[in-house]
Amino acid sequence: MHKSISYGRELRLLTPSHFQTVFSNPPVKAVTAHVTMLATPNELGHPRIGVTVSKKRAKRAVDRNRIKRQIRETFRLRQHKIPAFDIVIIAKQGIVEQDNAALRDTLNYLWRKLAKRCEQYQSRS
C-alpha cells in the first residue's frame, strides 16, 4: 500500500488549546535564526503542525502566506519521517528576506533536526 502525502485537516493544530499544549512546556525544540520549531508528543499516531507568522515579522499578507505555504509544503513531503508529535512553527525576525529556496533549505534542515530529536526524546522516555 502506498502512503498518502496529502495535507489534510487531521494534520493541523486547529484550536488555541492545541497550540497552548505545545507552548506550555515543549520537550523538543529545533531553532535557527529565522524559524523555531517546538514539539510535544501526541497519542494520534501521526504528526500535526501549527504555523505562526505574526504581522510584526512579515508585514504584508503575501509574505505571511508565502512563508506558511513553504512550511506546509515541506511538512507535507516529510510527514512520514516525523514521529507522532504536535509541532508549532514560529517565524522570527528576518524571515521575509529569505527567498523560497533558502527558506526551503532552512526548513528541510529543521525537519531533519526535529525528527532526530523527537526520536531521541521517545527513546529516553
UniProtKB/Swiss-Prot annotation:
Q: Name one GO biological process term.
A: tRNA 5'-leader removal
Name the reaction it catalyses.
Endonucleolytic cleavage of RNA, removing 5'-extranucleotides from tRNA precursor
Query: Under the GO molecular function aspect, what terms does this record hold?
Result: 3'-tRNA processing endoribonuclease activity; ribonuclease P activity; tRNA binding
A cellular component term from Gene Ontology for this protein is: ribonuclease P complex
Q: Which PROSITE patterns match?
A: RIBONUCLEASE_P
Q: Which InterPro entries match?
A: Ribosomal_Su5_D2-typ_SF, Ribsml_uS5_D2-typ_fold_subgr, RNase_P, RNase_P_CS
- Keyword terms of this UniProt record: Endonuclease, Hydrolase, Nuclease, RNA-binding, tRNA processing
Q: What is its EC number?
A: 3.1.26.5
Signal peptide (from-to): none
SUPFAM superfamilies, from UniProt? Ribosomal protein S5 domain 2-like (SSF54211)
Has the keyword Hydrolase been applied to this entry? yes
What is this protein's function per UniProt?
Answer: RNaseP catalyzes the removal of the 5'-leader sequence from pre-tRNA to produce the mature 5'-terminus. It can also cleave other RNA substrates such as 4.5S RNA. The protein component plays an auxiliary but essential role in vivo by binding to the 5'-leader sequence and broadening the substrate specificity of the ribozyme.
Quaternary assembly: Consists of a catalytic RNA component (M1 or rnpB) and a protein subunit.
Family, as annotated? Belongs to the RnpA family.
Stored PANTHER family: RIBONUCLEASE P PROTEIN COMPONENT
Write down the HAMAP family for this protein, in alphabetical order.
Answer: RNase_P
Protein name per the record: Ribonuclease P protein component
